[in-house]
């Protein structure tokens, strides 16, 4: 039986360069799935591109750390925007959980308006849905909508998160990130998953063509390196040789 490999490109909608990079890796590479930032400046462009990509799984990249929220959530914003102070609020047990529920629903509804259908699955920008206070909210919401979510199993075990009833891949790997991007690194994620006995795996990626909005990102030109690796023809063959079949989160349902 083939192992399922979901290659997800985060940050769909972040910019046109990000969008074009993800599309390139879907059409000419191994990206099968992406997750959309519905409050980002390039999201309408992303939704337009998707009309010609029927086989690309598109999920919701829930964000509480970037841009303007889609609902009135004053406790989470400063000067009207979201930011990384969320970590400090979480550490101090000061997260406004009711506001987070409202914003999650607002971003979900915005996704449906933009793409004309529910998301393929749910994950989050900067992995905020794996915070111990936020995970139960996202998990319950996803179960109500019968949607899969990304689960970092190691982090879930560390934080003692209840994943019962959650639809997700057996494994999740975020190693394909940073300054040492290569085909060998990508294939290592597959070999590691097999060694752990996982039948399904999601690998997180961030491929992009670089444009001006991305130049201010702390993770910029590495995105272009990811694109180059993910579109190498030899990579698809190496994946097949390891017994993996490319798919999306919908293949788990």
UniProtKB/Swiss-Prot annotation:
Reactions that this protein is recorded to catalyse: N,N'-diacetylchitobiose + H2O = N-acetyl-beta-D-glucosaminyl-(1->4)-D-glucosamine + acetate; diacetylchitobiose-6'-phosphate + H2O = N'-monoacetylchitobiose-6'-phosphate + acetate
UniProt keyword DNA repair, yes or no: no
Main location: cytoplasm
Protein name: Chitooligosaccharide deacetylase
Gene Ontology biological-process annotations: chitin catabolic process; diacetylchitobiose catabolic process; polysaccharide catabolic process
Top-level taxonomic group: Bacteria
A GO CC term assigned to this protein in UniProt: cytoplasm
Gene that encodes the chain: chbG
Species annotation: Proteus mirabilis (strain HI4320)
């Amino acid at each position: 039986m083939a192992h399922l490999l979901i290659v997800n490109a985060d940050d769909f909608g972040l910019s046109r360069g990000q969008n074009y990079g993800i599309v390139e890796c879907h059409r000419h590479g191994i990206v099968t799935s992406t997750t959309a930032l519905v409050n980002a400046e390039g999201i309408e462009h992303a939704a337009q591109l998707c009309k010609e990509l029927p086989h690309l799984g598109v999920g919701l990249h829930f964000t509480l750390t970037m841009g303007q929220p889609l609902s009135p959530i004053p406790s989470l914003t400063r000067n009207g925007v979201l930011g990384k102070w969320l970590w400090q609020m979480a550490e101090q047990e000061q997260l406004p959980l009711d506001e987070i529920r409202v914003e999650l629903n607002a971003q979900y509804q915005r996704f449906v308006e933009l793409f004309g259908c529910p998301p393929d699955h749910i994950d989050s920008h900067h992995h905020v849905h794996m915070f111990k206070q936020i995970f139960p909210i996202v998990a319950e919401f996803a179960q109500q909508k019968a949607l899969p979510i990304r689960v970092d199993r190691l982090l879930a075990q560390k934080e003692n998160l209840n994943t019962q009833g959650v639809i997700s891949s057996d494994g999740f790997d975020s190693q394909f990130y940073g300054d040492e991007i290569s085909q060998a690194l990508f294939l290592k994620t597959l070999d590691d998953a097999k060694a752990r006995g996982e039948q399904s795996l999601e690998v997180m990626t961030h491929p992009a063509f670089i444009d001006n909005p991305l130049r201010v990102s702390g993770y910029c030109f590495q995105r272009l390196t990811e694109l180059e690796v993910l579109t190498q023809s030899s990579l698809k063959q190496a994946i097949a040789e390891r017994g993996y079949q490319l798919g999306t989160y919908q293949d788990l349902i």
